[in-house]
């Protein structure tokens, strides 16, 4: 059974990025924050920009860096998840590599 929530009530005051609703992957809570924040997938945002706005990957990444990641809209600003890092367990700890 699915439960539908009113995002404005569940994450009151969270910044929603217009036109990027399809890139939402969750909601983030942390101690000391005044409320919940929307969690977006960087890769999904880049895909939306490429398809919707007919950008190349490089153009989409530059637009993301300056106009989305660089946007500060207050304490409940959106946060972004980048799944391009792969954790690798080593004998003496962890190593992190970028996906190719």
Residue ranges and their predicted role:
Residues 2-100:
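C-terminal alpha-helical interaction appendages
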């Amino acid at each position: 059974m699915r439960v539908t929530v009113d995002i404005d009530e569940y994450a009151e005051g969270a910044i929603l990025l217009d036109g990027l609703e399809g890139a939402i992957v969750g909601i983030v809570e942390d101690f000391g924050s005044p409320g919940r924040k929307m969690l977006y997938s960087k890769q999904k945002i880049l895909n939306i920009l490429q398809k919707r706005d007919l950008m190349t990957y490089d153009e989409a990444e530059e637009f993301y860096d300056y106009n989305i990641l660089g946007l500060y809209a207050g304490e409940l600003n959106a946060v972004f998840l980048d799944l391009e890092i792969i954790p690798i367990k080593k004998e003496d700890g962890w190593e992190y590599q970028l996906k190719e």
